[in-house]
């Protein structure tokens, strides 16, 4: 039943309940309020209006660039053939390091 109560309170409420029930932080004032209500301080009063910054002017959107896909050449997706993997495998085989062997002959399946 306690778990269902924690789930109904949400993350902030569950964390607050766990911290209060744990008894670890008794007598220590919380540095940060765990209240889910935004726009209010610890006493439930609205924030001081003097500290608010003036509203900023909206930034105008950058002009859109013309769309041109005639120069797009993605060879990775468009040059596949039946032997593409084998060709790349042969090209890269000269860069492979030899693998160590245990000295035993590998099983023949």
Curated annotation (Swiss-Prot):
**Primary location:** mitochondrion
Region annotation (Disordered) maps to: 33-72
Q: Which residues carry this modification: Phosphoserine?
A: 106
- Where would you find this protein in the cell? Mitochondrion inner membrane
The chain's coiled-coil residues are none
One Gene Ontology term of the biological-process aspect is: mitochondrial ATP synthesis coupled electron transport
Name the source's superkingdom: Eukaryota
What UniProt keywords apply to this chain's record, in alphabetical order?
Electron transport, Membrane, Mitochondrion, Mitochondrion inner membrane, Phosphoprotein, Respiratory chain, Transit peptide, Transport
What range does the transit peptide cover? 1-34
**Membrane topology according to the record:** Peripheral membrane protein
Which GO cellular component term is one of those annotated? respiratory chain complex I
Sorted alphabetically, which PANTHER family does this protein's record hold? NADH DEHYDROGENASE [UBIQUINONE] FLAVOPROTEIN 3, MITOCHONDRIAL, NADH-UBIQUINONE OXIDOREDUCTASE
Per UniProt, subunit arrangement is:
Complex I is composed of 45 different subunits. This is a component of the flavoprotein-sulfur (FP) fragment of the enzyme.
Q: What does this protein do?
A: Accessory subunit of the mitochondrial membrane respiratory chain NADH dehydrogenase (Complex I), that is believed not to be involved in catalysis. Complex I functions in the transfer of electrons from NADH to the respiratory chain. The immediate electron acceptor for the enzyme is believed to be ubiquinone. May be the terminally assembled subunit of Complex I.
Regarding protein family, the annotation reads: Belongs to the complex I NDUFV3 subunit family.
Name of this protein: NADH dehydrogenase [ubiquinone] flavoprotein 3, mitochondrial
**Species for this entry:** Bos taurus
| Gene behind this protein | NDUFV3
């Amino acid at each position: 039943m306690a778990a269902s109560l924690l789930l109904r309170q949400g993350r902030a409420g569950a964390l607050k309940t766990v911290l209060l029930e744990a008894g670890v932080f008794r007598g220590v004032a919380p540095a940060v309020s765990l209240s889910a209500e935004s726009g209010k301080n610890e006493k439930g009063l609205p924030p001081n209006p003097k500290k608010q910054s003036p509203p900023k002017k909206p930034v105008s959107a950058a002009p859109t660039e013309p769309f041109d896909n005639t120069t797009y050449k993605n060879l990775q997706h468009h040059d596949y053939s039946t032997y593409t993997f084998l060709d790349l495998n042969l090209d890269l085989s000269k860069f492979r390091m030899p693998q160590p062997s245990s000295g035993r002959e590998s099983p023949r399946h």
